[in-house]
């Protein structure tokens, strides 16, 4: 095989490898949702589901908008490993719980917010704000 063809083959193999390795990182971080960390917003609603999974747990709420119409709102939370260190469990939220949670809303206006790190959480009138440990900082 000619040296130039050999170099092209190696370069193509390298590029395919880099793209293949980048896909999982994009899948984890490439949700397409950008959050506005300058506008903490309190969302109040009723829990419909709590998904305790990696890479981030998700909380789903039925929230009434200004007109009284119920809309689903999703909250992206920490990973289960971090949440455990903060004193949370996979049974933290149950369907039907009344929740008030401070989130950073999606910049797009979508009904999605981020509660990664520490955010104020009240469940059925009880403060359930996660504890922050040195390891979480």
What feature does the model see in each segment?
Residues 22-24:
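N-terminal signal peptide c-region/cleavage motif recognized by signal peptidases
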Residues 2-15:
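Bacterial N-terminal signal peptides that target proteins for export
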Residues 26-41:
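Short boundary/loop segments of OB/S1/cold-shock single-stranded nucleic-acid-binding domains
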Residues 53-64:
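Short aromatic-glycine-enriched beta-strand elements
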Residues 85-101:
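Short nucleic-acid-contacting surface segments enriched for D/E, G, S/T with interspersed K/R
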Residues 106-135:
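OB-fold/S1-family single-stranded nucleic acid-binding modules
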């Amino acid at each position: 095989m000619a040296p130039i063809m050999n170099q092209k083959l190696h370069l193509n193999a390298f590029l395919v490898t880099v793209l293949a390795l980048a896909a999982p990182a994009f899948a984890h971080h490439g949700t397409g949702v950008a959050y506005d960390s300058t506008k903490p917003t309190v969302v109040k609603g009723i829990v419909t589901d709590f998904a305790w999974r990696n890479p981030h747990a998700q909380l789903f709420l039925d929230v009434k908008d200004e007109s009284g119409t119920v809309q689903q709102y999703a909250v992206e939370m920490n990973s289960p490993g971090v949440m455990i260190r903060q004193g949370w469990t996979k049974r933290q939220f149950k369907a039907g719980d009344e929740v008030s949670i401070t989130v950073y809303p999606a910049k797009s206006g979508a009904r999605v917010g981020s509660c990664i790190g520490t955010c104020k959480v009240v469940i059925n009138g009880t403060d359930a704000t996660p504890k922050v440990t040195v390891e979480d900082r």
